[in-house]
A protein has these predicted regions:
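Conserved redox-cofactor binding core of oxidoreductases
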Residues: 1-66, 70-72, 135-158
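General small-molecule cofactor/ligand-binding pocket signal
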Residues: 8, 49-51, 116-120, 194
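Active-site rim elements
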Residues: 25-28, 97, 121, 162-167, ...
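Residues that flank catalytic or metal-binding motifs in active/ligand-binding sites
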Residues: 52-55, 65, 113, 124, ...
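Short, flexible loop/turn elements at secondary-structure junctions
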Residues: 54, 58-63, 73-75, 132, ...
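Glycine-rich loop(s) and the adjacent beta-strand/alpha-helix scaffold that form part
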Residues: 59-62, 67-158, 168
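FAD cofactor-binding and catalytic pocket of flavoenzymes
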Residues: 137-234
């Protein structure tokens, strides 16, 4: 606050600017995933079928309409017909890949791979953004989480977690973050700072090494990258 960065009590209210405690999706001290929170309570519904261990090949397009999907399970193709609609929600990488394998995307690129064009949609796979990050680890003169990571203390933390769902192992690694502006006149933050109360370095093989002396790690992330990439089919 002394340097003009406010405390942000709720960074999900439309304004991220400031320093804030990180929210965690937890229940009873354990991580609560989307599957835990939303699928588990309704798994027995008669109108819901959950298929695991499967990967979608493509959407079935008939007369400019999505009528189903073809997916692979145990390497065998399975065709599934849709009664109403097909919703593509496979993430940044796989959503455009599925669309392009289905003939929806940049026509010239689809023809390169011998895919019949259903819809020439040049924007599919474009505008990929990567949030570059650098980190700095420092030893400090105040107690941090590092002092709690010795082998004997970790046994106690593990028991506290298993028996009471409390303690160190229930906390997210990054507990405090800040959304900052590199220039005061910017309308929105363009830098994100993450703070970890333990130093994490990497050895020559790229393995993470956790410092057990009092230390901190700071991650600096580009929030609004200007460079753009793309997702393309390899085959």
């Amino acid at each position: 606050e002394e340097i003009g960065v406010p405390i942000n009590q709720d960074y999900c209210d439309g304004s991220q600017f400031g320093v804030y405690r990180v929210y965690a999706t937890q229940k009873d001290g354990r991580r609560c995933s989307v599957a835990n929170a939303y699928l588990d309570p309704v798994r027995t519904r008669a109108n819901l079928t959950i298929v695991t261990g499967a990967q979608v090949d493509n959407i079935i397009i008939e007369n400019a309409r999505a009528t189903g999907v073809i997916y692979r399970q145990n390497s065998a193709p399975v065709q599934l017909e849709a009664t109403r609609e097909v919703i593509v929600s496979a993430g940044t990488i796989h959503s455009p890949a599925i669309l392009m394998r289905s003939g929806i995307g940049p026509a010239a690129h689809l023809r390169e791979h011998g895919i019949d064009v259903s819809v020439d949609l040049p924007g599919v796979g474009q505008n990929l953004r990567e949030h570059n990050t650098i980190s700095v680890a420092k030893l400090v003169s105040i107690p941090t989480m590092s002092a709690q990571l010795g082998p004997f203390r970790m046994v106690g933390h593990l028991l506290n977690y298993l028996l009471r769902s409390k303690g160190l192992l229930t906390t997210p690694a990054v507990q405090v973050m800040a959304a900052l502006k590199s220039e005061a006149d910017l309308s929105d933050p363009d830098l994100i700072l993450s703070m970890l109360p333990v130093a994490v370095n990497f050895d020559a093989k790229g393995n993470a090494v956790v410092e057990q002396r009092a230390s901190f790690s700071f991650g600096f992330h580009v929030a609004r990258p200007q460079s753009r990439g793309e997702i393309r089919l390899r085959s």
